[in-house]
Amino acid sequence: MLSTQVDTDKLNEFVGRFLGDLGATVHAGMVVIGERLGLYRALAEGPASATELAVRTGTDPRYVREWLSSQAAGGYVAYDPAADKFSLTPEQAFTLADENSPAYLPGAFQLALGSLKSVPRITEAFRSGAGMGWGEHDSDVFHGCERFFRPGYAANLVSSWIPALDGVQAKLAKGARVADVGCGRGASTLLMAQAFPNSQVVGFDYHAESIEAAREAARRSGVTNLRFEVAKAKEYEMGPYDFVTVFDCLHDMGDPVGAARHVRESMAPDGTWMIVEPFANDELKDNLNPVGRVYYAFSTLLCTPSSRSQEVGLCLGAQAGEARMREVVSSGGFTRFRRATETPFNLVYEARP
C-alpha cells in the first residue's frame, strides 16, 4: 500500500542522503584515529604510500592502508593511483594537520563521538524527562568541546569580537578585572589573559575536572595574570568586574536568567557583558541548514539535558536565537543589549546595565 504512494526519485534521493550520513558517522571515528596517531601530521610532510606513512608514524601498514582508503573515499586525502600514494592538499592540511589553524576541525569529531556515548542515557531521558549533567558525560566531551571551539576563539576573540564592543579593548589594555563564566577548560580565559597582560582574569566553571585542566594549561603557558576557580554561574565571587564573558554556555544553564542577574550584580556600573552563543536565527524554519543541524543535534545530546539537570531547567537549547537571548538578558536586569558581531558559527552580543 505504501509503495504506491512513494515517489521513487525522492526515495532514492533520501536513501542517498542517508548513505552519506552513515558514511559521515563512521568517518568521525576515522578522523579521531588519524589525529591521535599523528597520521594527518605525518602525511602533511609529503606524499606517501601506506607503508611509508606507517613507517613515519610507527603504525601497522595494513591498518594504515585501510584508513587511507577510507580517507580518500571521503575526500579527506588525495590519492594518486599511478604512484599508489596519498597526500594532503594545502586546504586539507590546514584543516586536519595544523592544530593552530583557525579551521582545525578534528576536535569536533572527538566531541561528536564523546556525545554519542551518552545515547543510552539520553534515550531514557526522552521517556523520563530527566536531565544529564555536563560532568556525567564521557571525558571526550570536555576535551572535544574545548578543541572544537578553541580555533574559532583564537581566530576571532581578540582580533574582532572584543574590538566590536564599545570601549572594552581600551579598558582591557589599560587594565581591567575580567570574569569568564562557564570557562570550561579555559581556552577563552587564557586567550584574554595573554592578549591583555595588564588585566586580571579569572575563569569560573562548576565542573571541577575542567577547572583542573584549565589550571594546568595556565601553568604550562607561564601566564600569571589569571586564575581559575570552581563555582556555579549564580555563585561565583563578586567583583566588581569591568568585563564579564560567557562563551557558548548560557543556553546550557538551568537558570540563565538567574545567571544573568548574578552577572549584573557582580559588574561595575560601567561594565560590559559579552555573550557568545552558537549562531541561530529566531525561527526554526530559518535554521534548517548544516549549521543548525549540527547545533540541534548537539543540543539534544548535551545542552538540553545539561539544563534539565539543574534547578529551573529552562532548556533554551543551542539554537535559542537573538530574541530569546534578549529576553533572558533583560530579565536579568540589563537595559542595553545588541548584536555586536557574528561569524558563521557564533553570535556575539553586548549587554550593559
Annotate each predicted stretch with a short phrase:
Residues 5, 9, 16-36, 41-42, ...:
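Conserved Class I S-adenosyl-L-methionine-dependent methyltransferase catalytic core
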Residues 47-55:
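Short acidic, hydrophobic short linear motifs in intrinsically disordered regions
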Residues 115-251, 256-258:
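Conserved adenosyl
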Residues 276-331:
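C-terminal alpha-helical "lid/dimerization" subdomain adjacent to the S-adenosyl-L-methionine
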Residues 257-269:
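A short glycine-rich, Lys/Arg-flanked "PGG" loop and its adjoining helix->strand segment in the class I
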Residues 177, 271-272:
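Short glycine-centered segments of the SAM/dcSAM-binding site in methyltransferase folds
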Residues 332-353:
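Core SAM-dependent methyltransferase catalytic element
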